[in-house]
C-alpha cells in the first residue's frame, strides 16, 4: 500500500513504518514537511537506513503539495498542529510555534489536502488533543471523509485522555467505532501495544 505522512517533521512516522521488523511495511511513503531543517534530517535518516527506494521526503507546503500525486494514496497519516493560532506561540521559537500552533496550516487545510491525496475508500489517520475533537470530526465530514474509528490515548490504565486517534474513510458510510483506551505505559515500562508499534513485537520481561 501507499502512504503519505503530512506534517512529517524529521520523518519519524515513515521511518517507524519501514522498520525491518514490520510484517507489512508500506510499498511507498511520501513525507511532506514545510521546514527545510527538518527535511534535511529526514533525508539523512532515509539515506542512512537505505530506504531511498521506499521513502520520499518532500519539502513543500501541504496546502499546495507540489510533486505529490493526487488520489494516489491508500493511507494518509498526520500529526497536525494542536493549538489554534494566537494561543501562546509568541513564547516559542518560529519552528516550535509552527509545529504546535495553526500558523502555517489549520485543520481544514489538512482535511482538504488529505481528501485530494486519498484514493476513494482510502483512510486518514489523525491524532489530536481532545479539545479539538469536534473540530476534527466536523472538518473530516465537510471534506468527504467519514470518521470510522476513534481511540483515546492515556498514559496509564484509568488515566485521563491526553490525545485522541481518529481514522476516517474517504467516501465512507456513517458509523463510528470507539476502541478501548490506548495505554502508553504499564507497570514495567511501555505497554505491549506501545512496544508492538515501535518494535513490532512484545518486549521480553526480565
Model segments located where?
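Residue-level detector of flexible, active-site-proximal loop/helix-junction positions
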Residues: 64, 154-157, 172
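Residue-level detection of beta-strand scaffold positions
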Residues: 8, 14, 55, 123-124, ...
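Conserved SAM/SAH cofactor-binding pocket of Class I
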Residues: 1-89
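Mobile active-site "lid"/loop adjacent to the S-adenosyl-L-methionine
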Residues: 80-109
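Conserved Class I SAM-dependent methyltransferase catalytic core
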Residues: 104-161, 165
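SAM/dcSAM-binding transferase cores
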Residues: 160-206
Amino acid at each position: 500500500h501507499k502512504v503519505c505522512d503530512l506534517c512529517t517533521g524529521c520523518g519519524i512516522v515513515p521511518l517507524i513504518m519501514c522498520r525491518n521488523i514490520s510484517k507489512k511495511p508500506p510499498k511507498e511513503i511520501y513525507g511532506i514537511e514545510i521546514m527545510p531543517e527538518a527535511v534535511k534530517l529526514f533525508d539523512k535518516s532515509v539515506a542512512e537506513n537505505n530506504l531511498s527506494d521506499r521513502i520520499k521526503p518532500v519539502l513543500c507546503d501541504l496546502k499546495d503539495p507540489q510533486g505529490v500525486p493526487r488520489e494516489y494514496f491508500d493511507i494518509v497519516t498526520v500529526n497536525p498542529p494542536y493549538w489554534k493560532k494566537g494561543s501562546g506561540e509568541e513564547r516559542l521559537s518560529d519552528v516550535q510555534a509552527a509545529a504546535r500552533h495553526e500558523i502555517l496550516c489549520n485543520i481544514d487545510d489538512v482535511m482538504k489536502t488529505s481528501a485530494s491525496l486519498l484514493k476513494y475508500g482510502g483512510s486518514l489517520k489523525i491524532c489530536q488533543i481532545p479539545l479539538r475533537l469536534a473540530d476534527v470530526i466536523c472538518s473530516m465530514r465537510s471534506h468527504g471523509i467519514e470518521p470510522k474509528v476513534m481511540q483515546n490515548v492515556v498514559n496509564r490504565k484509568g488515566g485521563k485522555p491526553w490525545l485522541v486517534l481518529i481514522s476516517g474513510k474517504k467516501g465512507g458510510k456513517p458509523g463510528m467505532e470507539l476502541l478501548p483506551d490506548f495505554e502508553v505505559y504499564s507497570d514495567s515500562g511501555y505497554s505491549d501495544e506501545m512496544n508492538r508499534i515501535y518494535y513490532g513485537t512484545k518486549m521480553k520481561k526480565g
